[in-house]
Amino acid sequence: MGNSPSTQDPSHSTKKEHGHHFHDAFNKDRQGSITSQLFNNRKSTHKRRASHTSEHNGAIPPRMQLLASHDPSTDCDGRMSSDTTIDKGPSHLFKKDYSLSSAADVNDTTLANLTLSDDHDVGAPEEQVKSPSFLSPGPSMATVKRTKSDLDDLSTLNYTMVDETTENERNGKPHHERHRSSIIALKKNLLESSATASPSPTRSSSVHSASLPALTKTDSIDIPVRQPYSKKPSIHAYQYQYLNNDETFSENSQMDKEGNSDSVDAEAGVLQSEDMVLNQSLLQNALKKDMQRLSRVNSSNSMYTAERISHANNNGNIENNTRNKGNAGGSNDDFTAPISATAKMMMKLYGDKTLMERDLNKHHNKTKKAQSKKIRSASNSRRSSFASLHSLQSRKSILTNGLNLQPLHPLHPIINDNESQYSAPQHREISHHSNSMSSMSSISSTNSTENTLVVLKWKDDGTVAATTEVFIVSTDIASALKEQRELTLDENASLDSEKQLNPRIRMVYDDVHKEWFVPDLFLPAGIYRLQFSINGILTHSNFLPTATDSEGNFVNWFEVLPGYHTIEPFRNEADIDSQVEPTLDEELPKRPELKRFPSSSRKSSYYSAKGVERPSTPFSDYRGLSRSSSINMRDSFVRLKASSLDLMAEVKPERLVYSNEIPNLFNIGDGSTISVKGDSDDVHPQEPPSFTHRVVDCNQDDLFATLQQGGNIDAETAEAVFLSRYPVPDLPIYLNSSYLNRILNQSNQNSESHERDEGAINHIIPHVNLNHLLTSSIRDEIISVACTTRYEGKFITQVVYAPCYYKTQKSQISN
């Protein structure tokens, strides 16, 4: 679209823009167009930018200044152009003046009764606004919908938008009482963005330049006030003061909240901003942060806080309590209530103190539980020493319950001399002859009632010199002693310090008895495995019960049973001296009697007041028992000892009764019993087996050769004679050992020419074939059933034959 030439002010005629001759050539080509005649000042738009920087006036916009300084009868060179000048007379096609201000003045009804005006023309002189402000004609086919109401001029519309904030402040009403916090924030953002926006001098569209400055000329936005749910927003976005019937009371409470906002909302956290637009996720995140921060409350202030909150609940107003606390002054202002963020918000929203009281009660109960747990752990712990008891005594006044902490001594059954050994166990402590009643003596007396003194000796080789290093290597004993040392804190133990980490316990040589032993070895109930180390060589003792560990090595073991003060494990002398079974004429070894030693001090001897040696029997060898199972048998052992069973009585083994009579099952003949006397060995030597004597021991080939008399009798007759004399047993007679051995030998000899491993018959039957019933197919109307068992390393196969008339029965059924 072309532009019509225009004249320029003579003051600007000397100023030529760069490339003006190109614009002149372009304007000459477009001078005959319709748009150049409609918008005769379009060509001069590029002159406006230059004039804006040099001749800027705050009252008149730059474009208006440029239009006022131009004359439409002059071109860009300052010369009059006769061929491009528009006739100023009346025209039949176009209006003489296309300015919108004149149309608005005469109420022209064209363009759907709409009045358009440039925002820069507001307040300008009348001679400057007569030129049209269109830069483009817009769409060729414009569609305009007629409306009943007319749109006023933008200048009139801008002046009608009154700042409601200023009016509310004049009336004494704060502006935040009229709108919600989200609307306030939106309004504030719009005002800030409009205040920072400035008109750009490089804008080329008058439509955009007309729409944006409307915000710059207004100081506020009028937004309709909505107050749903009949509640007033307080100074915070999440707090609301519900309306009361008494307006004076509600206004006073609102003023009171605003005055005490600093004291009440000291812990408001991230929810304290009044211009924050809240949603569900933002509220949850804020609550989490407040709860994490409020959870770190000092527990020492809980008692005072509970009293302060209970006083506040009686008054029924948290704000009044806060003011009273501020007036009281002193150190009470430093304490804060340990309430959660949720309870605090509910209190601010609804004035409800139920959740806050519940939080306080929960915190108080948690503190009480923690204190009671500390008391129980201090009273029941076996690791507490005398020094720790003194510290608990000093702390007793601080505890709220005021319990007197005293050490508890467990009761253990003790064998009494004057009473029967089958009576119920009683508590009895051992008297120790010591001059000082120190803490260590009390601990050792308590420890002696719990544990048992074990006497371990090395008796195998009495020639071991005193200079030899003899140790006991036992992980079980070392762990038990380490646990005792941690419990009793005994630093003056007679054992090595290495046994805390090394399972080696040094043995002491006794010059009087010429033996090695372990002094003062107190162990709890259980099973212990050990080995002896003599000059670095591990071995086991034959005087102690033996067993094998998981690697197959021989180890010694012994068991400590509850209810005894002293035990000395050893094996029976009968097992050590000889492993031969006693004959009937010899007297069986008796169980060793109980040895009792006089009461003495623990430090003077390793025997205690009720020393009892509990020997082990060959029937009680180690078979995979564990310490836990032995400890669990404590109650059962005590009940068994109190019963009527005599555990210490002599064991009477059963005497075996022998007989010389042969059962009828093994008799061969007419059933007459044959008695064999023990004193008839010198009568005469036994006859060899024959047809008439000991036929079971005869060889089958020799027996039938004798019956046939050198071939005079055939085999069938000899078999009939044999069957007439001896009845047919369960198994055929040809299934004797010699017959089977001959078959096996022949099969092995035949397989020597081939591969021996594949053809040889394995005499060892797989265990999967043992104790299984095997059968064969029916042949010659006979079925056989067999079963193989193993007895003392040998295999015995029993075969049972039975007639099976299968074909005969089938033929009878078919007939």
Curated annotation (Swiss-Prot):
This is SNF1 protein kinase subunit beta-1. It is a peripheral membrane protein. It comes from Saccharomyces cerevisiae (strain RM11-1a). The keyword Protease does not apply. It is found in: Cytoplasm; Vacuole membrane. A lipid is attached at residue 2 (N-myristoyl glycine). Phosphorylated by SNF1 in vitro. Residues 313-326, 377-389, 433-444, 599-608 have a biased composition (Low complexity).
